[in-house]
Regions:
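N-terminal export and membrane-targeting signals
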Residues: 1-15
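Short glycine/threonine-rich beta-strand-turn micro-motifs
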Residues: 30-192, 199
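Sec-dependent signal peptide cleavage junction
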Residues: 22-30
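Gly/Pro-biased beta-strand-loop elements
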Residues: 184-280
Length: 319
């Protein structure tokens, strides 16, 4: 009987000890990350997993600092579609040696960095602006051209995506290429201004006066049209074909050569049937006697032909 009582006492003692041991084990603090360990550049040594998650998440959310010319831009990783893979990094950190460097995995939504860069380009890029031609006080005037700016998108997407994935947050500089305008005040070509009332043709290079010619313009019944036109065709030694007009009724085409009403050169304008040409009728120059075209002395028409191009602007004004 005494043996049974002793055995029961021992078993009861062991049970109490087991309960105490379990209670003590449950009360043990959670494991800490070894000293000196970093995750993605964030020190987490000595922290609990929960505290380490918070520290790594906070560090990852530091905005990227982007420099675009004189503009400083801050953007958080979530805007770039980036999410840190923290759990796996914490698991590695818990079993790492002290002072270990643990990389932080980053998941990036495909296309998100490119979409962000596209928005930057839309806001900060600007197209090149060509010089524009106007007529002011009977003279050609050109607006000032302006260079454009174009973001190097491919490099920008690569640099931003790499930075957000590797933990870099500063020193990200994006570049814009200067886009030169095609048409400038300096390279603008010839411009013609015809003053119908005074029967004068002025040739300019851009805004700069070059030469003056006396011409013949249309008579009252067949006035030379007013407006802005361009040279659309240039012919050497042209044929003359009678137009569909009462004054040319019954006339036959005239081949190139002496007596051709168009002389040796034809510079057709964007106004149908109207052009600048030579004439064998030198006595008509200086008067309003044509059927709408602009006549010139043949040698002068040949010279002008060589100094204008298809597309040259022709202003015809009443003055």
């Amino acid at each position: 009987m005494k043996r049974v009582s002793l055995l029961l006492s021992i078993l009861a003692g062991l049970a109490v000890a087991g309960v105490l041991a379990s209670a003590l084990g449950a009360a043990e603090p959670p494991a800490a990350i070894p000293d000196g360990v970093t995750i993605g550049g964030v020190p987490v040594g000595g922290l609990t997993p929960e505290a380490a998650v918070s520290a790594v998440q906070q560090g990852f959310e530091t905005p990227l600092e982007i420099q675009l010319r004189s503009t400083r831009i801050l953007v958080t990783p979530d805007i770039l579609g980036a999410t840190p893979v923290v759990d796996k990094a914490i698991e590695r950190a818990l079993i790492a040696e002290p002072n270990s460097v643990i990389p932080l995995g980053v998941s990036v939504v495909p296309g998100a960095p490119a979409a962000f860069i596209a928005k930057l380009a839309k806001r900060y890029d600007r197209p090149a602006v060509d010089a524009k031609l106007f007529l002011r006080q009977l003279r050609p005037w050109l607006s000032k051209e302006r260079a454009g700016l174009k973001l190097d998108r491919r490099t920008a997407v690569h640099d931003v995506a790499t930075a957000v994935a590797t933990g870099v947050r500063t020193g990200i500089t994006l570049t814009q290429t200067t886009m030169r305008p095609k048409v400038t005040r300096a390279n603008f070509g010839p411009v013609i201004v015809i003053r119908r009332k005074s029967n004068k043709l002025f040739l300019y290079n851009g805004m700069h006066y070059r030469r003056l010619f006396l011409v013949a313009t249309g008579q009252h019944q067949y006035p030379t049209p007013l407006g802005r036109f361009s040279i659309v065709v240039k012919w050497k030694n042209p044929w003359w074909y009678p137009p569909d007009s009462p004054w040319a009724a019954g006339q036959d085409p005239v081949p190139p050569g002496p007596g051709n009403p168009l002389g040796t050169r034809w510079m057709g304008l964007s106004s149908p049937g109207v052009g600048i040409h030579g004439t064998p009728s030198d006595g008509s120059i200086g008067y309003s006697v044509s059927h709408g075209c602009i006549r010139m002395h043949i040698p002068q028409a040949e010279w002008l032909f060589n100094h204008v191009e298809i597309g040259t602007t022709v202003f015809i004004v009443a003055s």
